[in-house]
Amino acid sequence: MSDIAERVKKIVVEHLGVEPEKVVESANFIDDLGADSLDTVELVMAFEEEFNVEIPDDAAETIQTVGDAVKFLEKNSAA
């Protein structure tokens, strides 16, 4: 697992209070991890802060799984 993936996993565990083993690439934030729309906004904000990147609203709407977040951040962050 990449450094970015590990950091994403840590943020998801902290913000959603889920077991680390549930945070897999295919896990959907809402359907699999129990997030609501406010949780997803807070996750995006946490990703922006952790990775020093701005995630536009249209991109944020496409980030629905852990893997989506990792792919976006690998492509767009300098961290």
Curated annotation (Swiss-Prot):
Family to which this protein belongs? Belongs to the acyl carrier protein (ACP) family.
Source domain of life is Bacteria
Q: Which SUPFAM superfamilies match?
A: ACP-like (SSF47336)
Q: Known InterPro entries for this protein?
A: ACP, ACP-like_sf, PKS_PP-bd, PP-bd_ACP, Ppantetheine_attach_site
Give the pathway listed in the UniProt entry for this protein. Answer: Lipid metabolism; fatty acid biosynthesis
Modification O-(pantetheine 4'-phosphoryl)serine, positions: S37
- The gene behind this protein is acpP
Subcellular localization is given as: Cytoplasm
Q: Which SMART domains match?
A: PKS_PP
- Cross-referenced PANTHER family: ACYL CARRIER PROTEIN (PTHR20863), CARRIER DOMAIN-CONTAINING PROTEIN (PTHR20863:SF76)
What function does this protein fulfil?
Answer: Carrier of the growing fatty acid chain in fatty acid biosynthesis.
Q: How is it modified after translation?
A: 4'-phosphopantetheine is transferred from CoA to a specific serine of apo-ACP by AcpS. This modification is essential for activity because fatty acids are bound in thioester linkage to the sulfhydryl of the prosthetic group.
Q: Coiled coil where?
A: none
Picking any one GO biological process from the record gives: lipid A biosynthetic process
| Protein's name in the database | Acyl carrier protein
Main localization category:
cytoplasm
All residue ranges annotated as the Carrier domain in the record: 2-77
Output a single Gene Ontology CC term carried by this record: cytosol
Q: What residues form the membrane-spanning segments?
A: none
Q: Which organism is it from?
A: Methylobacterium radiotolerans (strain ATCC 27329 / DSM 1819 / JCM 2831 / NBRC 15690 / NCIMB 10815 / 0-1)
Keywords assigned:
Cytoplasm, Fatty acid biosynthesis, Fatty acid metabolism, Lipid biosynthesis, Lipid metabolism, Phosphopantetheine, Phosphoprotein
Tell me the GO molecular function terms: acyl binding; acyl carrier activity; phosphopantetheine binding
